[in-house]
């Protein structure tokens, strides 16, 4: 009996932590507003299932009113079980829509065997989801990318594209007509793995990206997990650095006007928080060495 109580306690503790992280991200970035209709994109993977579940829980206790409509894009992948998602969504008693579009055949026809399919697949999906959002009258489009996805994107851009660029928690589409949000932006993947197992979500594997083990993104994922094991706090601080950008100590002339930099007796704005001549903030390093700076799971600023 004691073991069962302990399991239930741990499950409730995890759910509360996830709700807090998702709620914090929503507040920090103004993701959801009163009267919004949020189109929650559900792929059949652990992340999107968890996102839908957590948004439904938060909606019950939120001080604002917003609608949820779950949307799945059936890309006609071989062996895709067409009944699992409709049955699951129907059991939740929420509005949902299944969009059937054979993007799988297009991707397989255009991309040679052995080449990465993610780029074309994501572009096709994006266009379809934008259209569906218009048809459903959705004001926000929620995607299930989590903290680790954001860090992997940051490192991919740094290592392979030479850009200091990540994956934003909230963005406006290129056509200016849609707002995309990522409510799981603060959530580490390992917590979603635990939550998915606890909730027993009916996971559906992807026969496109899920069958490409040598992707560079997978290399980044393994690197992050190795860091978490060998260097506690490193991944959390890497993520924290995305919240504390100091353009004056980088090299982008568009982000900081180096050419017109002059001697001044007063500092304001970015210059005031640039730490002047210091490239390394020793106080933070001292705290980290003492084990007092961001240990364990990332906690966003309150």
UniProtKB/Swiss-Prot annotation:
<feature type="short sequence motif" description="PP-loop motif">
    <location>
        <begin position="43"/>
        <end position="48"/>
    </location>
</feature>
<dbReference type="GO" id="GO:0005737">
    <property type="term" value="C:cytoplasm"/>
</dbReference>
<keyword id="KW-0460">Magnesium</keyword>
<keyword id="KW-0479">Metal-binding</keyword>
<keyword id="KW-0820">tRNA-binding</keyword>
<comment type="similarity">
    <text>Belongs to the TtcA family.</text>
</comment>
<feature type="binding site">
    <location>
        <position position="121"/>
    </location>
    <ligand>
        <name>[4Fe-4S] cluster</name>
    </ligand>
</feature>
<keyword id="KW-0808">Transferase</keyword>
<keyword id="KW-0694">RNA-binding</keyword>
<feature type="binding site">
    <location>
        <position position="209"/>
    </location>
    <ligand>
        <name>[4Fe-4S] cluster</name>
    </ligand>
</feature>
<dbReference type="Pfam" id="PF01171">
    <property type="entry name" value="ATP_bind_3"/>
</dbReference>
<dbReference type="GO" id="GO:0005524">
    <property type="term" value="F:ATP binding"/>
</dbReference>
<dbReference type="GO" id="GO:0000287">
    <property type="term" value="F:magnesium ion binding"/>
</dbReference>
<keyword id="KW-0067">ATP-binding</keyword>
<keyword id="KW-0004">4Fe-4S</keyword>
<dbReference type="GO" id="GO:0051539">
    <property type="term" value="F:4 iron, 4 sulfur cluster binding"/>
</dbReference>
<dbReference type="InterPro" id="IPR014729">
    <property type="entry name" value="Rossmann-like_a/b/a_fold"/>
</dbReference>
<keyword id="KW-0547">Nucleotide-binding</keyword>
<keyword id="KW-0411">Iron-sulfur</keyword>
<comment type="pathway">
    <text>tRNA modification.</text>
</comment>
<dbReference type="GO" id="GO:0034227">
    <property type="term" value="P:tRNA thio-modification"/>
</dbReference>
<feature type="binding site">
    <location>
        <position position="118"/>
    </location>
    <ligand>
        <name>[4Fe-4S] cluster</name>
    </ligand>
</feature>
<dbReference type="InterPro" id="IPR012089">
    <property type="entry name" value="tRNA_Cyd_32_2_STrfase"/>
</dbReference>
<dbReference type="InterPro" id="IPR035107">
    <property type="entry name" value="tRNA_thiolation_TtcA_Ctu1"/>
</dbReference>
<comment type="subunit">
    <text>Homodimer.</text>
</comment>
<keyword id="KW-0819">tRNA processing</keyword>
<keyword id="KW-0963">Cytoplasm</keyword>
<keyword id="KW-0408">Iron</keyword>
<dbReference type="GO" id="GO:0016783">
    <property type="term" value="F:sulfurtransferase activity"/>
</dbReference>
<dbReference type="GO" id="GO:0000049">
    <property type="term" value="F:tRNA binding"/>
</dbReference>
<comment type="function">
    <text>Catalyzes the ATP-dependent 2-thiolation of cytidine in position 32 of tRNA, to form 2-thiocytidine (s(2)C32). The sulfur atoms are provided by the cysteine/cysteine desulfurase (IscS) system.</text>
</comment>
<protein>
    <recommendedName>
        <fullName>tRNA-cytidine(32) 2-sulfurtransferase</fullName>
        <ecNumber>2.8.1.-</ecNumber>
    </recommendedName>
</protein>
<dbReference type="InterPro" id="IPR011063">
    <property type="entry name" value="TilS/TtcA_N"/>
</dbReference>
């Amino acid at each position: 009996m004691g073991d069962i109580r302990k399991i239930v306690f741990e499950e409730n503790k995890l759910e509360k932590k996830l709700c807090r992280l998702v709620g914090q991200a929503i507040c920090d970035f103004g993701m959801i507003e009163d009267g919004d209709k949020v189109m929650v994109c559900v792929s059949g993977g652990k992340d999107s299932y968890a996102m839908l579940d957590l948004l439904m829980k938060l909606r019950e206790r939120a001080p604002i009113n917003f609608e949820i409509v779950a949307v799945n894009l059936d890309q006609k992948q071989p062996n895709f079980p067409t009944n699992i998602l409709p049955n699951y969504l129907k059991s939740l008693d929420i509005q949902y829509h299944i969009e059937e579009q054979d993007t799988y055949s297009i991707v397989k026809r255009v991309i040679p065997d052995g080449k990465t399919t993610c780029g074309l697949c994501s572009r096709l999906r994006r266009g379809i989801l934008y259209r569906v959002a218009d048809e459903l009258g959705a004001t926000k489009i929620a995607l299930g990318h989590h903290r680790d996805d954001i860090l992997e994107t940051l490192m991919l851009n740094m290592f392979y594209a030479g850009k200091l660029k990540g994956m934003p928690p909230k963005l406006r589409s290129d056509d200016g007509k849609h707002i995309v949000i990522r409510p799981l932006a603060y959530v580490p993947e390992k917590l979603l793995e635990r939550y998915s197992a606890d909730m027993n979500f009916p996971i559906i594997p992807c026969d496109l990206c899920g069958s490409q083990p040598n992707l560079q993104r997978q290399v980044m994922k393994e690197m992050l997990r190795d860091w978490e094991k060998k260097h506690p706090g490193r991944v959390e601080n890497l993520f924290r650095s995305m919240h504390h950008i100091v353009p004056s100590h980088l090299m982008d002339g568009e982000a900081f006007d180096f050419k017109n930099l002059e001697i001044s007796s007063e500092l304001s704005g970015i210059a005031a928080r640039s730490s002047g001549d210091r490239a390394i903030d020793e106080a933070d390093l001292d705290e980290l060495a003492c084990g007092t700076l961001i240990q364990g799971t990332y906690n966003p600023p309150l």
